[in-house]
Amino acid sequence: HPFTQMKTAGPALPIVKGNGTLLIDDKGNAYIDAISSWWVNLHGHSQPYIAEKVYEQMQKLEHVVFAGFTHSPAVELCEKLSKHLPSNQAKFFFSGDGSSAVEIALKMSVQYWKNKGENKTRFVALDGAYHGETFGAMSAGARSIFSAPFSDLLFESTLIPFPKDEQAAIKSLKTEIAKGDVAAFIFEPLVQGAAGMRMYKPETL
C-alpha cells in the first residue's frame, strides 16, 4: 500500500468492485472515488463500452511489439489523433503509464540532439511541475518531500516561472533556450494538478 500514510492510517478498506464514480467495499458500502486524475480512473469504473472493446480486442490480439510489426488498432488511433496535430508533430509513442512516457520523451529528446551532433542535455520545466515518480520524471519536476530521499540521484533541471505572468514565463523560457544546451521543455498543458490545480491560458501554449 505505497500511497497510504502508515503513521495515521487505519485498516485499509477492502474494495471488491467499482461502478462509475463509486467504489464498493466487502460490506456493500459505497464510496465516491474522487481520485480520477490518477492513472485510468477518469472514465469511471467498469465502464461498459471500454470493457466490451477490451474484451473484443483480447480475443484477437493482446500485444505485439512495434519492432517490425504493426496492427490496425494502433494505426487507426494514430490516424485519428494526427488530424488534431500540426503535420510536424504527427508522431506517436504509446506507453503504459505517465512516468514511463516522460522517461521515454526525455530520452528521445536527448537522442534527437545526439543524432544531430549537438550536446543538448538540459531540461526546462515549469515551477511546481510534477511529471511522475521515476527518476527522470522526478528530475524534470519541482523538488518536494516525496523526492527528497532521492535527491542525490536526480539530475538538475531548470524551472521557469509558472505562466500566471505569461510574458515573464515566455521571456524566461527564451533566455534558457538561447543558452544552447536545452534538450526539451516539458510542461503540463493548461493545469498543474499536484501543484494545487493551477491553471493557465490555452493561448500560452
Q: Where do the language-model regions lie?
A:
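A short, flexible beta-alpha/helix-coil linker loop
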Residues: 37, 60-61, 165, 190-193
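Active-site-adjacent loop/helix segments that line or gate small-molecule/cofactor pockets in enzymes
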Residues: 1-22, 36, 69
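Acidic surface patches and DE-rich sequence motifs
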Residues: 25
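PLP-dependent aspartate aminotransferase-fold enzymes
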Residues: 79-187
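Active-site core of PLP-dependent enzymes with the aminotransferase class I/II
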Residues: 191-205
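Short clusters of small/polar residues that mark proteolytic maturation junctions
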Residues: 35-36, 139
